[in-house]
Amino acid sequence: MGRAIGIDLGTTNSCVAIMQGKDTKVIENKEGARTTPSIVALTSSGERLIGAPAKRQATTNASNTFFATKRLIGRQYSDPEMKNLSVPYKVFAAKSGDAWVKTTDNKEYSPSQIGAFILQNMKEAAEAYLGEEVKDAVITVPAYFNDSQRQATKDAGKIAGLNVLRIVNEPTAAALAYGLDKKHGHTIVVYDLGGGTFDVSILEIGDGVFEVKATNGDTHLGGEDFDNGVVSYLLDEFKKSNGIDLKNDPMAMQRIKEAAEKAKIELSSAMETEINLPFITADASGPKHLNMKLTRAKLESLVNDLIERTMAPCKKALEDAGLSASQIGEVVLVGGMTRMPKVIEKVKEFFGKDPHRGVNPDEVVAIGAAIQAGIIQGDVRDVLLLDVTPLSLGIETLGGVFTPLIERNTTIPTKKSQVFSTAEDNQTAVTIKVHQGERKLAVDNKLLGQFSLEGIPPAPRGRPQIEVTFDIDANGIAHVSAKDKATGKEQKIRIQSSGGLSDDEINRMVKEAEEKAQEDEKRKKFIEVKNQADSLVHSTEKSLTEYGDKVSPEDRSAIENAVNELKEVSKSDNIDDADSIQQKVTNLSQLSMKLGEAMYQASQQNSAENGFSSEGNPNDKEEKVVDSDYQDIDNKEENK
């Protein structure tokens, strides 16, 4: 078995880590950073940029730069959370009803594909570090992700060419990283406020056992919402001062969003910051600039309701665990937003103790994922992880009522069976709708899918005995099987969700990813050969200027023609022209050897004229070599 990596696929940033012996190592990306922005951009030339390069060009390519797509993964376009989505790129309803994204040239991508591009980047960083291919990975998700979101994340891993060993809840992974060396048992809370989601989990840890007692959260609450609060304030203030609404200006909106995020980060350590965006727009009177100061107090007032929203899940998690705040031994902060002083203050106020700050909130989840990978591969022993399902799983019963079969916070993996029957005489088929959630009515919960049991022998209603088994695996993903108790015939049933990616779609995306990897390799070769061509043209033209008169007119003409041909072919942006450019490079290199010979001969001639030869200075033969007298000071001192 090869090396397995742990990946934190975040809304704002992603991180990859690996076990090395008993230690963990966070792997740096190509830019030397330990985290990578979860941003993917498609350029007009067809190039795909990931991470910091994508973020740098977002202002000028906002409509084709996809960020925070983790908020779309596994979601239907009709979901209530989609209504308040504020992004510069196009989000639309795919045929399945899922929320997908679209470029300005109408190329369509599922959020799982965008996630796969980021996972591929993480995979490549690990392979560059290890010097070997990586196939296996543990990927983290918010604890409050439902079945569809977990499955969509697993699909992203498959599209990226990874075998997903396990889907792990982010707070649980953080607890693993925090408590691996803790021997004495105690209860901890992991408060995880990231870029797009909020989770809170309560765990009992000690002697290698990590048992999740309860979890809660909000999959649409995070740093993006804090940024949007600042953006709204800046837009309103600018409109008041200048009478111009910038909401429909994508480039201005992208600049303001970046400035808002930067200001938010700065105000975690400073009391005041200045936002200065020159030439943000223009009207008949000339260019307009956005220049205003933002204080920490103002920021806190803008986002206070968001911080307050994190308290209700904390309260619910404590209730589900049957604990009070005073019974919590440690509060571990995870996620970049937990650096905000107001968040720290609110957590301290709620739990009555200073939060633990001994972990890096940006890296701890990836480290925990790497530890889980080590556990699965047998590299980490004597550690038992007992996680829970965050949401109840059940079916729709008579009158549209939601009947839970597996309650939330049930330790996973778990299995529960229920016997169903027919509602009418001689009924030969039964349709079962599977839902996930906590609402009383099935329609208010997430419909995971539905399936039909067919071929039931005709009988009076209520007579057939159909045992349906609901199974949640260690990834938190649901499976269903059915058994006709009368005949003993058993059938495994796959839940066919109304949304999600089909096997054919996943296979197509895997193939596209492989083809794109080949195209990326071709593009890399194309860029390298163009750089080689530019360098050769520059050096050859310089040599022609200095030594062109040292070669025959015929040779000089041939070299000049070769230079012009290489210049012309190098203008191409078609990656398929790499071989043509390489041929011209080879041709010019061979012709330039004549120049090299002329340069060498000129160098030899200069040496001879200055009285030097390869044997040395001839005048040296006339001189006598005289050994100088010396005294050994140390010995002289000793002999005194």
Swiss-Prot record:
Signal peptide: none annotated. This is Chaperone protein DnaK. Residues 537-556, 599-640 are annotated as: Disordered. The lineage of its organism: Bacteria, Pseudomonadati, Pseudomonadota, Alphaproteobacteria, Rickettsiales. Residues 601-617 have a biased composition (Polar residues). CDD domains: ASKHA_NBD_HSP70_DnaK-like. Acts as a chaperone. Gene3D superfamilies: 1.20.1270.10, 3.30.420.40, Actin, Chain A, domain 4, Substrate Binding Domain Of DNAk, Chain A, domain 1. Pfam families: HSP70. The keyword Nucleotide-binding applies. SUPFAM superfamilies: Actin-like ATPase domain, Heat shock protein 70kD (HSP70), C-terminal subdomain, Heat shock protein 70kD (HSP70), peptide-binding domain. The modification Phosphothreonine is found at residue 197. One of its GO terms (molecular function) is ATP-dependent protein folding chaperone. InterPro entries: ATPase_NBD, Chaperone_DnaK, Heat_shock_70_CS, HSP70_C_sf, HSP70_peptide-bd_sf, Hsp_70_fam. Residues 539-556, 618-640 have a biased composition (Basic and acidic residues). Transmembrane segments: none annotated. Induction: By stress conditions e.g. heat shock. Keywords: ATP-binding, Chaperone, Nucleotide-binding, Phosphoprotein, Stress response. PROSITE patterns: HSP70_1 (PS00297), HSP70_2 (PS00329), HSP70_3 (PS01036). Belongs to the heat shock protein 70 family.
